[in-house]
Amino acid sequence: MPRVKRGVTARARHKKILKLAKGYYGARSRTYRVAVQAVIKAGQYAYRDRRQKKRQFRQLWIARINAASRQNGLSYSRFINGLKKASIEIDRKILADIAVFDKVVFATLVEKAKEALTK
């Protein structure tokens, strides 16, 4: 059985990891052993934060809608409840955009929500 030398495979694996660690600080971008740990940790952070991003954007949208609806005299929860009663189905992402960029339209939505709450 011939002897198998694994230099080519090892070099390729090391290059792959060091390429992924490019731009990291200090030994994390130069030393294979440290770079492996850094790349694994970065992958864990990326996996976690892809999920957190969805939560954080929803929080941002709610904060923006709340601020805009309070300027029009209605709390966030009552505003959303009013929209549901008025059977206006606009998601929070679009509501937040309207609240920031088109205050007149948002004010009319708040008025419709108020009307639905008083009925």
UniProtKB/Swiss-Prot annotation:
GO molecular function: rRNA binding; structural constituent of ribosome
Key words of the record: Ribonucleoprotein, Ribosomal protein, RNA-binding, rRNA-binding
Gene Ontology cellular-component terms listed: ribonucleoprotein complex; ribosome
Gene Ontology process terms (BP): ribosomal large subunit assembly; translation
Superkingdom, taxonomy of origin: Bacteria
Function: Binds directly to 23S ribosomal RNA and is necessary for the in vitro assembly process of the 50S ribosomal subunit. It is not involved in the protein synthesizing functions of that subunit.
Family the entry assigns: Belongs to the bacterial ribosomal protein bL20 family.
Designated name of the protein: Large ribosomal subunit protein bL20
Organism, scientific name: Shewanella amazonensis (strain ATCC BAA-1098 / SB2B)
